[in-house]
Swiss-Prot record:
Similarity annotation: Belongs to the IF-1 family.
Functional note: One of the essential components for the initiation of protein synthesis. Stabilizes the binding of IF-2 and IF-3 on the 30S subunit to which N-formylmethionyl-tRNA(fMet) subsequently binds. Helps modulate mRNA selection, yielding the 30S pre-initiation complex (PIC). Upon addition of the 50S ribosomal subunit IF-1, IF-2 and IF-3 are released leaving the mature 70S translation initiation complex.
Any one GO MF annotation of this record: rRNA binding
Protein's name according to its UniProt entry: Translation initiation factor IF-1
UniProt gene name: infA
Gene Ontology terms: cellular component: cytosol
């Protein structure tokens, strides 16, 4: 899968799940489950409930995503 196949959306973290998974509510109202990307994990960036995040989704499964950026 190439980077062009995925698209980004903004959302808010609703709650934290085990294994660095998060429930995220997107701007369009959908609720998805997202994990954190490797760069966020490597740099020990903490993601808490209520944080604004950017999520990368694939067209194959719109219920799962990857958190690629945490807004301040």
């Amino acid at each position: 899968m190439t980077k062009e196949d995925s698209f980004e959306m903004h959302g808010t973290v609703l709650d934290t799940l085990p294994n660095t998974m998060f429930r995220v509510k997107l701007e369009n109202g959908h609720v998805i489950v997202a994990h954190i990307s490797g760069k966020i994990r490597k740099n020990y960036i903490r993601i808490l409930t209520g944080d604004k995040v950017t999520v990368e989704l694939t067209p194959y499964d719109l219920s799962k995503g990857r958190i690629i950026f945490r807004s301040r």
